Curated annotation (Swiss-Prot):
The lineage of its organism: Eukaryota, Metazoa, Chordata, Craniata, Vertebrata. Maximin-z shows antimicrobial activity against bacteria and against the fungus C.albicans. It has little hemolytic activity. Maximin-Hv shows antimicrobial activity against bacteria and against the fungus C.albicans. Shows strong hemolytic activity. InterPro entries: Bombinin. This is Maximins z/Hv. GO terms for cellular component: extracellular region. One of its GO terms (biological process) is killing of cells of another organism. The keyword Repressor does not apply. It is found in: Secreted. Residues 1-18 form the signal peptide. Expressed by the skin glands. Belongs to the bombinin family. The modification Asparagine amide is found at residue 70. The modification Isoleucine amide is found at residue 143. Keywords: Amidation, Amphibian defense peptide, Antibiotic, Antimicrobial, Cleavage on pair of basic residues, Cytolysis, Fungicide, Hemolysis, Secreted, Signal.
Length: 144
């Protein structure tokens, strides 16, 4: 009788342990799925913010170009306007990567293409921000 009792209790313990292991595996896979979804959402938000930032910079650059185009310009203003036009061309090429320098991207795989444009964005955003900052500083000095 004791042997049957020991076997029954052992079986219950083993089945309970197996169920808990199964639940742990399921919860891990659910957590992984949730983490993946969270990462996708974060990437989507980051892409949207980058797109909004590019649009804002393009709008600001257009406004500055129009301002410099309509007034009297010094040599420095002329140089700033040329830089702003170049920045606007670069920002447009970021929006339409398939049209931007096909020679550059010919023969590369998709990951290398993405890396090229990420590097281009980084290379452009730094000077753009400093250029916009200096242009705004110049405008504020003239107004003030």
């Amino acid at each position: 009788m004791n042997f049957k009792y020991i076997v029954a209790v052992s079986f219950l313990i083993a089945s309970g342990y197996a169920r808990s292991e199964e639940n742990d595996v399921q919860s891990l896979s659910q957590r992984e799925v949730l983490e993946e979804e969270s990462l996708r959402e974060i990437r989507g938000i980051g892409g949207a913010l980058l797109s909004a930032g590019k649009s804002a910079l393009k709008g600001l650059a257009k406004g500055l170009v129009e301002h410099f185009a309509n007034g009297k310009r010094t040599a420095e203003d002329h140089e700033v306007m040329k830089r702003l036009k170049a920045v606007m061309r670069d920002l447009d090429s970021l929006d339409h990567p398939e049209e931007a320098s096909e020679r550059e991207t010919r023969g590369f795989n998709q990951e290398e293409i993405a890396n090229l444009f990420t590097k281009k964005e980084k290379r452009i955003l730094g000077p753009v921000l400093s250029l916009v900052g200096s242009a705004l500083g110049g405008l504020i000095k003239k107004i003030g």
